[in-house]
Amino acid sequence: MIQFSGRACLRQGWKCAAGVGLRCHGAHSSPPLHVPPFRRYTATYSRADETGHIDTAPNESVFYFDSVLPVKALFSRRFAPLDLAPSMTGRIGNLIIKLTGATPLNVIGRAFPLELQENIQQVIPRYSEGGAFVKLSHPPNMDKEGLSSLLNTHLEQNPLKLWFSPFTSVRASLVRGRPWLEDLQRSPSSRIKVEFLPTSPGASSVELTPELLYSLSRRYGKLADIIPQPSDSKIQPRYALLDFTRPSYAVIAKNCLHGYKVSASEGGGSAGTLLKLSYERKLKPHVIRGWIVSHPRIVIPIIAAVIAAITVIVFDPIRTFFIKIQIAPPIDVQDNRLWQWIQRQASKANDILSLRQRQRSDSRGLKAIWEDRKEDIQRLQTWLLEATNTFTVVHGPRGSGKKELVLDEVLKGYRHKLVIDCKPIQEARGDSATINAAAAEVGYRPVFSWMNSISSLIDVATQTLGANAGLSETLDSQLGHILQNTANALKKVALEKKRWDGKDSHMTDEEFLEAHPECRPVVVIDNFLYKANNNPMIYEKLSDWAAALTVSNIARVIFLTGDISYSKTLSRALPNQIFHEIQLGDCTPDVAKQFVLDHLHTDQSNSSSYTQAGPDTIEGGDIKDLEDCIEVLGGRLSDLEFFARMISRGQSPSDAVHDIIVQSAAEILKMYIADVDNTVRNWTPEQAWYLVSSLAEAQGGSILYSEALFSDLFKKDGESTIRALEQAELISVTTLNDRPSTIKPGRPVFAAAFRRLLEDDVLRCRLGLRTLGQQIAMENANINKYEGELQVLGSLEKEPKEIRPRVRWLLEKLAGSQAKIEKYEKESVGLRRILQSKM
């Protein structure tokens, strides 16, 4: 509490900003506390804080001044959990009013006439209510009513409006009761509860009428309503509610009327009635929480909308920024010479410490490949500069160098590019993992994929109430949101030149993008249609998104795929368009040989720890052996690179090829024949073995597409089975005039692996027996069907002549099936004999 003694300050000769000499003192300090001239007051705690009341002499009165402090309800709730000490409360209050300059002393000094300023005895600020109590002595020949009239007249003639309350003047009201100066956690309210208490123990009190309450409280502000206690209420003591139009009016009434004794002449009963005033909340405690809990159908959708709005407003710009950084890094360290030098030095240090060959990138020895595919590279670069709105598709089997061709050669000078690999997205398990994988590919962060699981649980809970909260999002919608943010970032990157270069400022964004195709970033979608049967929705979203980018001239889109059915998916997204297509196959033997030699030469020049087989060793030895090995191995880049790596480790070419063939045979046996789950894969081991054995025995290493399709094993869904085996890369289907023509091994080395598997008599006999058993079962099923129909026809009383051709046909079919069964049985006997002899 703060006390100010006016006379003492005059005796000391100090002057304050209001023109009143003041000295500040505390009730517990006996000697006076001298304050420097530049310090306006000192915070102390007087007896009023301890008792909660202001003691007055007969010649003293107390007035309440409203709108004195700028901060209201500061200590009512905001610091409730802190349990601030009185000294701390005073220091905070002092700091606030010092910073604002609206000290109670300054305001009250300006509110009093000059002739009354020396009568100020005590100033008690009320921080929580924005006002202050002032105790002053009566001038000679003036009572409290006259003093109140004098103050009000002065304030009417000289209105005092402070900067924090420009529309409200300071008011002075005579305190008629005995105010309770509590420091409880109670915030002011526009509603006052008036309790009617007896003036002394054992006495009785009366309930004041609304008319009497109006006459007592109207002087402090306009009333909105007076609510008496219901007559049937048994709550004691009796009370009434006063609703003021403003909370400030209620504050004045509470501070001036609390403790007022209504005499008998005023209507307070024979013994009088004591008024006890307190703030009353218009809303009951926890009413908002109760309403929220009882109305989940309304509240939960609102919460969902708020969360969505916050996500869009706050996080979407951040996510777009991170995506933009991934598309166009502010500092391209890959082309920086210093960064490249640091990488080289770090690699050399790693070689020395690990005593092993430095691992280089997969682009070693690719110069010969790029020379052979120079025409394809130039064609792709030309397409990127054209203004046509269509897709560019680079198709080729896995390991044919599609990604290296596009990123290392075609887009070598492009700074603004985005690579999206579909493989980690498809291999992710669960919606959350899929969202994280998709976000990582484009740089979309922060990602709150775990929120979707929580939201799903909330949706399940709310559905029991008959409502759908709509908090959880489907995988489709979340992927769409990621792609939409990526499109926004791509558009910003494409328009960077327009923003920095003022030449095209007169153009709209669409006109600029159409006129400057060279400014469009490039989006490379790798492994397109990888495991498309698992989750085709992802590829539908990607193709639709890529079509929108292409049509809007925002970006160029290049698809890298090994699936020959890509045109079906892309044509749905971008119909009536001819795609730019590049078909990458295997290298020719000469290019493959040069690739291996260049690869070995690079390895030899970088070797510093041990001797390796290099091109000199091979060329000096048996170059014919290398050529023969490459002819067996084929021109697949991944196999050639593995072959060169094995030679660089010291193996001979023949040993390296032998190891690759053995490894490929084991891979075929495990992936396509031995561990086949028919519920997951669309082929049986017998169907895979039929193609393996047929291709191993075929002249030229290929069979006709119709030959496999007309086999008994492929009578049911034969085309879909062959397509599934092609997607699994066991075989490859070549086309002629846009129709399937021949079937070849999926990789050139598979031809030798097929022959190796067929040379294994035990494996050949076991799988042959399984195949023959399946064929016998199929023929038995046909015979049962024929016999059933013959039985139906034979049950007729008279045999019509019209059914005789049908009966003859059924008998021929039955005989043919029986002949096949006998043939299969004879082959089975031979295979069993071989198997018994080998085992």
Curated annotation (Swiss-Prot):
Keywords assigned: Coiled coil, Membrane, Mitochondrion, Mitochondrion inner membrane, mRNA processing, RNA-binding, Transit peptide, Transmembrane, Transmembrane helix
Domain RRM: from-to ranges: 190-282
GO BP terms, alphabetized: mitochondrial genome maintenance; mRNA processing
Transit peptide interval: 1-42
Topological relation to the membrane, as annotated: Single-pass membrane protein
UniProt keyword annotation of Flavoprotein present: no
GO cellular component, as recorded: mitochondrial inner membrane
CDD domains per the UniProt record, alphabetical: RRM_Yme2p_like (cd12433)
Single GO MF descriptor: RNA binding
One Pfam family hit: RNA12
Highest taxon above the source species: Eukaryota
TM spans (from-to): 298-318
Mitochondrial intermembrane side: 319-839
Subcellular location(s) per record: Mitochondrion inner membrane
Protein's job: Plays a role in maintaining the mitochondrial genome and in controlling the mtDNA escape. Involved in the regulation of mtDNA nucleotide structure and number. May have a dispensable role in early maturation of pre-rRNA.
Name of the protein in its database record: Mitochondrial escape protein 2
